[in-house]
Amino acid sequence: MKTIDKAEEAQLFATIDRWIEREVAPRVKEFDHADKWPAEIVEQMKELGLFGATISPEYGGLGLPATTYAEIVMRISSVWMAITGIFNSHLMLALAVEKFGTPRQKEHWLPKFATGEIRGGLALTEPDAGTDLQSIRMVAKRDGNDGYVING
């Protein structure tokens, strides 16, 4: 189980809170109403290490425990939930690579994910389901030892 020193965690939360107060909160309406990509905010998220928040330090990430990460997401979401999706979906893919990737894949992708140089994401949709995950019916079935067959 990952751990973090309480003083270090408090300092991290204080940094996030200052960033939210100074940079995020004043701009939420501007970006939301203009339906504009928050490029400057994303760059700041890179600088804060949010794209590597849960990635192991071995690959350049912060290696935060889930509880610390969840608190960060909660704090940011309380002001602007939409921007948490930018790094949350990214970290879902990073987690899959870190847990299930080959050593070569990990060495290649995780350092780039950790810095935000490249970002992962996910897309879930079907013609009759849209993005309603409960309605998705497509499945992948193993086809011998060579791979999978997808029914959609």
Where are these regions (language model features)?
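Glycine-rich, Trp-frequent "lid" loop and neighboring beta-strands that shape
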Residues: 61-62, 104-152
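N-terminal capping segment at the start of a domain
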Residues: 17-29
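Short, contiguous strand/loop micro-motifs
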Residues: 3-4, 27-29, 96
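Internal helix-loop-helix
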Residues: 17, 47-107, 111-116
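Short secondary-structure junction/hinge motifs that connect adjacent elements
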Residues: 27-48
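Intrinsic disorder at enzyme termini
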Residues: 1-11
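A generic secondary-structure micro-motif detector
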Residues: 6, 30-32, 62
